């Protein structure tokens, strides 16, 4: 049974009374509970718009979006967003206090809060780092704290918008492995936005490839069976890469030919 459903979703942005831009048109997608779904596509194809609609930050112009059969009409605790930067961490709080923030707002007792925060610190590989402030942590560690903090709110789904995009290549690969471990431990459903084909193959159960904008929708969905393999030289990885790259290249070439004709 699908956890998330997009049905014929349309999103039009109005610049002024006479100018509009249709980012999405006829967008359909189902994401299953416990699934890790990666959304990939050319720049400007509407990937982040899809995430913002599911997060409730934007309202669709047409169509319907449901989570667990309930219409999405705004932000909610059942969805947690992890952004690319680390600005969402509270600089004046320790790592543990950042993780405790949500449970404290829900009235969870102090002793239970601390135990919960420590369990998530352990889950993200940061045991013993709870008393440090964000400025004392590396970029990768800050992202792990962000993930731990949103998981402490026990969401039905994680929404991740290129969360590792600002990290160096080596740290990014470490974080991909860590995120795989975290997902295997929690099986919280994930919508992961990326422009990196490698990253999508390593992380995703399925990869949705979007058409170039405007009026974007899903071009294809590729089922991935890497089963925890992070070797980019593995024959299975290479085959998936070729398949996904061909889909995206087709969209990019089509856009370039249209621009040339114009």
Q: Model segments located where?
A:
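The feature captures the beta-strand-to-loop junction immediately N-terminal to the Walker
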Residues: 40-42
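Helix-to-loop junction immediately C-terminal to a conserved catalytic motif
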Residues: 55
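Short coil-to-helix segment of the ABC ATPase nucleotide-binding domain corresponding to the Q-loop/switch region
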Residues: 93-100
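Catalytic Walker B motif of ABC-type/P-loop ATPase nucleotide-binding domains
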Residues: 158-161
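Conserved ABC ATPase "signature" region
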Residues: 100, 111-129, 181
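Conserved ABC ATPase signature
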Residues: 133-137, 141
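A short, proline-enriched helix->beta-strand linker immediately N-terminal to the Walker B motif
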Residues: 152-156
């Amino acid at each position: 049974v699908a956890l998330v459903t997009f049905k014929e979703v349309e999103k039009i942005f109005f610049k002024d009374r006479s100018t509009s831009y249709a980012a999405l048109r006829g967008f359909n997608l189902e994401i299953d509970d416990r699934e890790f779904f990666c959304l990939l596509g050319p720049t400007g194809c509407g990937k982040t718009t899809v995430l913002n609609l599911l997060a409730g930050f934007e309202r669709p112009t047409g169509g319907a979006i449901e989570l667990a059969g309930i219409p999405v009409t705004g932000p909610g605790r059942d969805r947690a967003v992890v952004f690319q930067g680390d600005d969402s961490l509270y600089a004046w709080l320790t790592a543990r206090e950042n993780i405790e923030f949500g449970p404290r707002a829900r009235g969870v007792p102090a002793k239970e809060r601390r135990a919960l925060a420590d369990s998530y610190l352990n889950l993200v590989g940061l045991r013993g780092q709870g008393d440090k402030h964000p400025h004392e942590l590396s970029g990768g560690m800050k992202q792990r704290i962000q993930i731990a903090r949103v998981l402490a709110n026990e969401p039905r789904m994680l929404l991740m918008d290129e969360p590792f995009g600002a990290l160096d290549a080596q740290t990014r690969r470490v974080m991909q492995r860590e995120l795989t471990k975290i997902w295997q431990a929690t099986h919280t459903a994930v919508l992961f936005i990326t422009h990196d084909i490698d990253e999508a193959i390593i992380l995703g159960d399925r990869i949705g490839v979007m058409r170039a904008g405007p009026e974007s929708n899903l071009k294809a969905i590729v089922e991935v069976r890497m089963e925890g393999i992070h070797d980019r030289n593995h024959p299975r990885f290479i085959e998936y890469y070729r398949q996904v790259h061909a889909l995206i290249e087709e969209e990019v070439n089509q856009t370039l030919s249209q621009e040339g004709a114009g």
